[in-house]
């Protein structure tokens, strides 16, 4: 389109008219313009002039070329000569009105005449003319012609005098002097008309300025004018260039911190440059950067500083706005005033360079603008540098460049030393630049005085400008750098990223108090800002302002603050006010570098401290905290001194500039904000208090917080990344410390938490985020938690969660805390007291020896804490976690290591971590991290879960809502973001909550605390952790399978073992598991929450959604409860427990060994100690088991919570894996739970106490872990595929039970939390053997994996079923593999490869059939809930077994191959590794059990001839299922009377006792599972070891019976196995580990309960089987042969057995898949066993109830589980029938 640009002469801008063509006519242009401008053609005409040529267009037809610019004027119609004021229309005289009417009515009057006609109506003219005339007349008076005054025409009035010559007689225009250039008229004298004389002042000189002539003839001027003239009024035209005025600038000088270093004027749009942290005008710095060739920073001269990296300095901008508002200052050309800061920049750059890397923010923190006087800044910078240089020795390592800054901060940081240094440095530097340093000096004194809070306040107030600078980067940087800079420097993590670390909590508080908001801002977006701010100005200017920067200079980074917090309450006391002394290692004088023990790495590099190798900063921090900080504590100001200092500083601040006032106001606002936050924190603190109150809780809770702290330490720089780092930095050191220390660390974190500023986010947030408090805290601030707890809040909360008694927010952010205020003082003292008590209570105990040690225990908590933080907040955390996944970081960071690994595995390690994750996760599965954390969690969860489990539905609902809103946000943020956090710090966000782990831990905790759904979420997390690996990759899923195997073993052992033993064992297991993998975490969640699961499961049965997840939890709980119940039930069961424990421990150990092999050694320092013994001493299995049991005892409570959380995890995994799976699991869990409950109700009286709980526990534990797979599988996808699909979305977080329990946050949907259940010695031995087996069976697993994949691909309807089958196969295989591993490792390798292929083919076939059936139901009810899922699995397994039996016939053939491939591949996957690990464990214990079971089964398995073909398939399947079966047979063999007898004998009498079988199945669910697992294992062994035996068909009846028995076991065990088998791929091992395959989250509640029972049975059987392992090992081959036929028959009878099995639980699905084999065992047997299983379940439920009662929620959970079990039972019965039909079809098919 062509266009012409026009503008009215009165307008500034051109408008455009568009037209077609090259030209537009003038007429058209006028029309368009009038149309656009809404002008009326009658109103005026338009005069168009060419804007360039000034040519006026007059011809309407003139063509104006396109793209011309024209100027438009409105002119009257008819036009006006542009230069003339006379109208074009000639008129004699203006016709006013009708004065001169034209009376001659000629026939046609001219228009000119007509316009003068008065009576137009009678005029002789056309109407148009009349109208025109009328218009003209009406507007004539307004005609420009009439504008001229007539008086100028003709002789003027006699009184008129010419204005030019002053003579009368002519107008000025006619003045004769007009042409006289030499004429000068005298001054014109005005008359004072209208001005009252009273306002006038007579003057004599008429020439006086403003003189006027009065009516009296005298001259006068207005009085006010005279006064103004006397003063010399400067009236300037508005737009004249201003003369540089000295008045307002001088009167109200701009604070230097508000001055741009470049333009020397007040900053506009202040931005922080990341390199040195200085602030400039946005335009100035951008111009400077762009004008420099290499984008060189004008201050620090760093090259390649991208203008895009500039961070808006919101605080400084606010300060500038406030300054402008207060002073009315308008930006003037102030560039003339080059401030002295230029010198500062050089030193500052120096500092900045040194500090820049280390303390970037501090030094650079804009020495100039931030420094009150730029000169001061420079001077200060220099002195700071010098003094800092003195400090540099101390700071140099970390913050060489921060010396100058450090000195100032030093005073802040080190109270005493700080003061001297501060006064000396601050005053020196500030006073050096005295002009502007006055504020700086005040600041300095402020710093020296109240290096803590007042320092910040003073600094901020004194350097109000700094508030702006600190505001975002500078303020925060200051505070962060002061308190946090150290960590910042320490980890370089974000210079201030580790606010908690660098600025001790308090300095953070003080500086952050002032900077609280900034920290948050910084956390969010200003980390770099902080770095830059802190770097740039922080050290010099900011240091002055905020002594903290100096501290950051000290490498004593963050960790120091925490120590002061807890290690030295006195020190912390002075410190909290904002004193950052702890920032230096307080022990170290500001000038001294922290001692090696402190191991403060250069700020940029947190070293693995001597004490704590993993947390880069952690150990140093911890050491420093415990040791150095105490030393420095003395130097830090005493409270009185501190208050005095602060008072003095405040007074000085009051003297400061308005900017300071503004800053103070700003700080006050911040303080208010912090107060709110602090109160929240207190709230959290209170809730935390319970943890503090409870030693365990504290240990675990503190651990969690410690995790927060450790994580914080770890993420020091990340810490800046708002939440994780907080938590994270705190946690790593602590976690490294060990449990006690970990708690200490946490405590320390709490100490940190004094202001808990450490997290940048308000301390309260830390509490909030990290709140480890039980529901007390949670209940207290669930909403708070919810509300603020977005990601940041949670992160913050996590961050603060572990904070020791939190001081006031003011204290936290020092700035706002005015300790002069008696209230503040008192509050601070109170805080000190509390802190001291807290410290004495928690930290002191741990500080000495425990802190470093707790890595094993603490690691559980810490890693989780660390992980989220690490992953989320800090690349270090993330990277380190990954790097130290099992290594140094894994000790304390076992979780962390795991976490990063998991998260990393999830994200970065998705591909490589599939295998790596397998091993690592399996290694990590035994990781201690989880156990420890879960211990904490257990403790906390005991309270929490009591509350949590009380209202599972409500909690779950609210948690789900909350989680979906906040926790899922957080979860997604924390857990889900964990992956991203892994890759990128949030923020978590914000805030990380150290949310990755912190998120997980917190998420778990939050989930549990917030809701049972939270527990569910945690469970889901566990599941997710367990299945996170699987979801990460199916490879990871299998990896998770092994982890879950480990979990299963752990859970098994915990299940069987006494709750305390379980707790211990699970804690140990979890410890190993957590670092090892999400599976471990899940395991932990599963393991720890066994009790929790039982409680939860029972409650969850009431709340089906919650139920589902909680059923899983309950299964864990029940497993736990079942352990004692099982023991009570049978002595054999305790033996089984031992066996299972040892098996679990072995598996754990294997997993642990893997973990240790990878990075678990570090991570499993604790595990290494505990599990290391286990690993090293398989013989001391029981000893380790005892430890593990001890651990598990603690975790038991946590297990409840843990279990509960895994439900959610499972749900999340399911959601992620398959939303169908979610619904399916929920519904399946619900329905199967209900079914089981009803079935169990019948059986419950028999075995509910022992077996119901066990079943629940086993089911729960497995369920929680396996839920992932069930979710995946139930969801209708191969776990592998799902894992692969979810690999990116899901992250497997391995948490120790304690970590899991302590984790308040709801796991992100994408996060699978695997709870590491501490492995018993036996479990570890099993694990070791499993590890060998894994090595052996990994190929088989690899083969199995394709099966699952193929299954998924080949049988879409039975894809899930296949997957389930595969999962079942995998667990069976794994169980079998573990057994064989020790005895037939090589044979199994070779034969298992062959037999696995054949067996797995058969088994895969059956499983795939069951899987297909299961999956079809799963797919159908995929949308259903987990219980539905399992119910659907069962029902659809039954129905689908019918359908699938046909499709299974087809699919089975394909699935045989697929199963062989998938199963082998699956087994080859990490799941397989886990399976193998489990198998290894199972081999030793399970083999014995299996051999026993197989001997019994031999009786039952005459029809192995039938198994010949099916046997090979069954073998493969059993190779998977046998781990489960092995576990089952372990259980049933361990408790042969119950399980074996019912199962083994039932197998023979399977047909006779179909109905009976239901009860026995329930009863023997675990036993049968074990049997089934044992049989499967034996079958697997047969397939592996006795491949030839597989063809050896005993009798199809025997095989059927065996299969039925196995199926029944599988059914009993598979009940949970349904979802379990879904999860199986990943959780195969875990199911296998748990032999009871508790984790059928599809039937998570009932199945989980069954699983728990079964798992407990498996645990008991495990013990018995372990004892019998030798016998079984011998019999293993024979039994394996029988088992294989049994498996084959299981497959054939998979349908029949699946009916029962399915009715029972995922056992159907496992029996087909596992569930298939198990189901094959015989529908009657299945029914009998189901009954037994349900009896077991009920017993387990009873035991679970007892357990839950012990835990506080036992009754409710039991009720829930009973209800669920009933429903599940009902569904099971339905499923049984369906499965029977399906089994029959399958048998026909087979």
Swiss-Prot record:
Disulphide bonds in the chain: none
Disrupted-gene phenotype: Early embryonic lethality before 7.5 dpc, accompanied by accumulation of p53 and widespread apoptosis.
Domain of life: Eukaryota
SUPFAM superfamilies, per the entry: Retrovirus zinc finger-like domains, RING/U-box
Enzyme Commission code(s) on record: 2.3.2.27
GO CC annotations on file: centrosome; chromosome; cytoplasm; nuclear speck; nucleolus; protein-containing complex
UniProt key word Cytoplasm: yes
EC main group: transferase
Compositionally skewed regions (Basic residues) per UniProt: 736-771, 932-941, 1727-1750, 1761-1773
Residue stretches making up the DWNN domain: 4-76
Phosphoserine PTM positions: 245-248, 361, 517, 769, 771, 773, 781, 816, 862, 874, 958, 1179, 1278, 1329, 1342, 1348, 1646, 1648, 1651
Pathway connected to this protein: Protein modification; protein ubiquitination
Segments of this protein annotated with the region Interaction with RB1: 983-1139
Record GO terms (molecular function): nucleic acid binding; protein kinase binding; ubiquitin protein ligase activity; ubiquitin-protein transferase activity; zinc ion binding
Modified residues (Phosphothreonine): 985, 1272, 1469
Chief location of this protein within or outside the cell: nucleus
Comment on protein domains: Contains a N-terminus DWNN domain, a zinc-finger domain and a C4C4 zinc-binding RING finger domain. The ring finger may indeed be a U-box domain.
Function of the molecule: E3 ubiquitin-protein ligase which promotes ubiquitination of YBX1, leading to its degradation by the proteasome. May play a role as a scaffold protein to promote the assembly of the p53/TP53-MDM2 complex, resulting in increase of MDM2-mediated ubiquitination and degradation of p53/TP53; may function as negative regulator of p53/TP53, leading to both apoptosis and cell growth retardation. Regulates DNA-replication and common fragile sites (CFS) stability in a ZBTB38- and MCM10-dependent manner.
Name recorded for this polypeptide: E3 ubiquitin-protein ligase RBBP6
Species of provenance: Mus musculus
Taxon lineage: Eukaryota, Metazoa, Chordata, Craniata, Vertebrata
Gene of this entry: Rbbp6
